[in-house]
Amino acid sequence: MIDSGHLRLHDTVAGAVRDFVPLRAGHVSIYLCGATVQGQPHIGHVRSGVAFDILRRWLMARGYDVAFIRNVTDIDDKILNKAAAAGRPWWEWAATHERAFTAAYDALDVLPPSAEPRATGHITQMIELIELLIETGHAYTGGSDVYFDVLSYPDYGQLSGHKMDYIHQGEGVTTGKRDQRDFTLWKGAKSGEPSWPTPWGRGRPGWHLECSAMARAYLGSEFDIHCGGMDLVFPHHENEIAQSRAVGDGFARYWLHNGWVTMGGEKMSKSLGNVLSIPAVLQRVRPAELRYYLGSAHYRSMLEFSEAALQDAVKAYVGVENFLTRVRTRVGAVGTGELTPRFAAALDDDLAVPIALAEVHHARVEGNRALDIGDHEGALTNAGAIRAMMGILGCDPLDERWESRDETSAALAAVDVLVAAELESRQMAREQRNWVLADQIRDRLKDAGIEVTDTVNGPQWELLAGDKQVDAR
């Protein structure tokens, strides 16, 4: 247990850093909005996972018992549309890409969540929440849909700061709404789409409803921290607050939001075509190096991707790794030591990772100096502190997680899972004689540095920059 000062976190509702006081002493409950499993994960997706994994590790180091819930949105318009375009069942499409996200998180040593609920597994809880909202006058039916009445909740806008006169839900004009500022809780069934029976007819859940219902199911009516990307502040998180507090739930007491990964000043997004997939990056750097890069900026700041910045992070990580290896070779085994007070103070100050990393590199410089003058005790002390600090950040170079693999095996394991999903889509397209789509998938893989060869034993792939070939699954 870390004996440090008081943890302070930036709460989006307050617009300021606040002292963190958990609902129950010794326990922290966290809900992180996970992936909508519509496609392959890119580094913008996993930045959120890494950022709040550091928060979780720091809370655990401070002695807290942490319940960490990360959901999976496995039913959504985008999933249905992309699965239909690929000629695949929606549930298969979602499951394939859920596995890809799991592989990406695992490759970067993001700790598994305490629970990872899927939206489709919690339809009953969603229906119960809608019934409560209707009973309390906060929701109404409109045609085959159910909507939340925004005007019925006076505090609407408290998270995002949006004024009622300027609210736009992004749902388009819907005839069943009493007010176009209202948002959808339940979508009436459409031909060919999955649906579930309800008192209002068959249909499927709205996006915002899913998270409120699952957070309630796993963490109760009130919990400590809700996390997610800053792009979710409005409308997603604003609507979560409204529908949960409208039925009397306290819901989240702190709201934390991470910044985007950007390219050329634009948010990394599939719709903009500027995404950088996990396989493409892991072809060039090791998983520990990518994790170091994604976690090195303050979680609330934008992370502008560039090859130069990525290589700077690799160089910094390798510098730490080389120092620890030097000490182990010249002095002996390096155990995990004590965190420095400045490192602890940095993380207590709203997870100021850049300042914490400055302390890591200060210890590296001091440790190298001690090693050079034969001060083995000083070298070991600094090396032990570095292992402790890098462990909190999830990328201790001497941790068996990273040491047990050679330089490329971890990357190849992750790439294998991710590429297999793409090849599965390509094979489906070929079977349907959709040669255009099949060629597009092949070309997309080639752009990421992966060469696909069709053989009598099925497709095989290899990294263009390497010499190891792996049979496709």
UniProtKB/Swiss-Prot annotation:
GO terms for cellular component: cytosol. A motif ('KMSKS' region) lies at residues 267-271. Zn(2+) binds at C33, C211, H236, E240. SUPFAM superfamilies: Anticodon-binding domain of a subclass of class I aminoacyl-tRNA synthetases (SSF47323), Nucleotidylyl transferase (SSF52374). ATP binds at K270. It comes from the Bacteria. This is Cysteine--tRNA ligase. CDD domains: CysRS_core (cd00672). Gene3D superfamilies: Cysteine-tRNA ligase, C-terminal anti-codon recognition domain, HUPs. It catalyses: tRNA(Cys) + L-cysteine + ATP = L-cysteinyl-tRNA(Cys) + AMP + diphosphate. Coiled coil: none annotated. Monomer. Binds 1 zinc ion per subunit. Its EC number is 6.1.1.16. InterPro entries: Cys-tRNA-ligase, Cys-tRNA-synt_Ia_DALR, Cys-tRNA/MSH_ligase, Rossmann-like_a/b/a_fold, tRNA-synt_1_cat_dom, tRNAsynth_Ia_anticodon-bd. GO terms for biological process: cysteinyl-tRNA aminoacylation. It is found in: Cytoplasm. Keywords: Aminoacyl-tRNA synthetase, ATP-binding, Cytoplasm, Ligase, Metal-binding, Nucleotide-binding, Protein biosynthesis, Zinc. It is an enzyme of class 6 (ligase). GO terms for molecular function: ATP binding; cysteine-tRNA ligase activity; zinc ion binding. A motif ('HIGH' region) lies at residues 35-45. It holds the Pfam family DALR_2. Belongs to the class-I aminoacyl-tRNA synthetase family. Its cofactor is Zn(2+).
